Amino acid sequence: MIQLEQRIFAFDRLGDFLRNINPEDPTYDHLFDTIDRAKSNNGWFSKDNVLHAFSAWGQLLNKKELIQWTLPYSFNHSAPKTIGLVLAGNIPLVGFHDVLSVLISGNKALVKCSSSDPLLIAFLIQKLQEFEPALVSFVEFTKERFTHFDAVIATGSNNAARYFEYYFSKVPNLIRSNRNGVAILDGNETKEQLEALALDIVQYFGLGCRSTSKVFVPKGYDLNLIFG
């Protein structure tokens, strides 16, 4: 059994790796090769967007944040559970939080990656296991239907969600379907806030389930504040 402190340390080391990405450092050759292959597999995964996703995770995966996040929970399992993960792939690394949640809680992840993002999460898990080899037995990737699992987290379209709800009905499950992000403006937003909203709209080409796709404004609102 890997102790929580070991798991946190492994993810902290992964975060440190992501915080220090340097194209001139041979240590990162594999990372940049993976980015190139991910772009070839999915044209929406531009180098800038993938690097942004890596950077965001680099900021989150630090010892202080991980300790604060896990502090309210007790992870005293008699034995790890196997959690099936059907991951989305609409934006780079969108499914990594599910993998993190399963592993940080001391459970095993049975991972089915989206065909849109089959490379990036596998790369991060490989690096994580280099930092903590004991985690090798805690992650299994598959392209087949799940056959041995205790619970499932599955993400997909509304149609896929209906299938998931039927297929996984006999085990504890968390099913996610389509989501849309909206912004509600009152007219008092600063220039910096509007610039941040613009980023929420266009980052990852607007393909994220939390990408802002609709904006509500007061009657008579000066749209030049947005488009100007």
How should these model regions be labeled?
Residues F32-G43, Q203-V215, G228:
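Flexible, acidic loop-helix segments that line cofactor/substrate-binding pockets
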Residues M1-G84:
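N-terminal Rossmann-like NAD(P)+-binding subdomain of aldehyde/semialdehyde dehydrogenases
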Residues T27-D29, H52, V99-L100, V152-A161:
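Short N-terminal helix-initiation segments at or just after the protein's N-terminus
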Residues I2-D16, T142, H148, L199, ...:
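Conserved C-terminal structural/oligomerization subdomain of aldehyde/semialdehyde dehydrogenase
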Residues T82, E132-Y221:
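Conserved NAD(P)+-binding/catalytic subdomain of aldehyde/semialdehyde dehydrogenases
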Residues W69-F131:
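Conserved small-residue-rich beta-alpha loop and adjacent elements
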